[in-house]
Amino acid sequence: MLNVGATAPDFTLRDQNQQLVTLRGYRGAKNVLLVFFPLAFTGICQGELDQLRDHLPEFENDDSAALAISVGPPPTHKIWATQSGFTFPLLSDFWPHGAVSQAYGVFNEQAGIANRGTFVVDRSGIIRFAEMKQPGEVRDQRLWTDALAALTA
């Protein structure tokens, strides 16, 4: 997993609406919360992204943006986003399979999916918060809000 202080690898991925999203597009403008999740329509992932949705103004505002990333394809993400009311981008790390997850060091080779990795990237592209949970472990989203708040203090 990439460490705090490292430069966040740039990427271009398709969201649930087939739109291209690049990390560098936020450079100089917003801090970015990157939330890697294993798969759509799974218990812990549903719960975590429901919490993100329910507290979205804390993560998606004038100072920050939230991007969720998994190896699932955009059509699956579209259905899940529609059913769950997710308005933030769900990015597809589908092909090359898991390339962005691998670049961030959160790809689970054995399972072929991303582990629950979370990164806060500042406006200059530097990682200011990094964590990774193993399958079955739930993340504490208060850590994300604290990390983002520290960048705007």
Curated annotation (Swiss-Prot):
Which source organism does the UniProt entry give? Mycobacterium tuberculosis (strain ATCC 25618 / H37Rv)
- Name of the coding gene: ahpE
Q: Which UniProt keywords apply?
A: Antioxidant, Oxidoreductase, Peroxidase, Redox-active center
Task: For this entry, list what GO says about its biological process.
Answer: cell redox homeostasis; cellular response to oxidative stress; response to nitrosative stress
Gene Ontology cellular-component terms listed: cytoplasm; cytosol
Q: Which PANTHER family match?
A: THIOL PEROXIDASE (PTHR43110:SF1)
- Give a yes or no for keyword Transit peptide in this entry: no
InterPro entries in UniProt: AhpC/TSA, Peroxiredoxin_AhpC-typ, Thioredoxin-like_sf, Thioredoxin_domain, Tpx_Peroxidase_subfamily
Q: Report the EC code(s) recorded for this entry.
A: 1.11.1.29
> Subunit structure, per the record?
Homodimer. Forms both dimers and octamers; a tightly-associated dimer and a ring-like octamer.
Q: Which GO terms describe its molecular function?
A: peroxidase activity; peroxiredoxin activity; thioredoxin peroxidase activity
Residues annotated as signal peptide = none
Q: Do you know which CDD domains this protein is assigned to?
A: PRX_AhpE_like
Q: What does it do?
A: Thiol-specific peroxidase that catalyzes the reduction of hydrogen peroxide and organic hydroperoxides to water and alcohols, respectively. Plays a role in cell protection against oxidative stress by detoxifying peroxides. May represent an important antioxidant defense against cytotoxic peroxides, especially peroxynitrite, which can be formed by activated macrophages during infection.
Positions annotated as active site in the UniProt record: 45 (cysteine sulfenic acid (-soh) intermediate)
Pfam families in alphabetical order = AhpC-TSA
Family matches, as SUPFAM superfamilies: Thioredoxin-like
The protein's name? Alkyl hydroperoxide reductase E
- Share any extra remarks: The active site is a conserved redox-active cysteine residue, the peroxidatic cysteine (C(P)), which makes the nucleophilic attack on the peroxide substrate. The peroxide oxidizes the C(P)-SH to cysteine sulfenic acid (C(P)-SOH), which then reacts with another cysteine residue, the resolving cysteine (C(R)), to form a disulfide bridge. The disulfide is subsequently reduced by an appropriate electron donor to complete the catalytic cycle. In this 1-Cys peroxiredoxin, no C(R) is present and C(P) instead forms a disulfide with a cysteine from another protein or with a small thiol molecule.
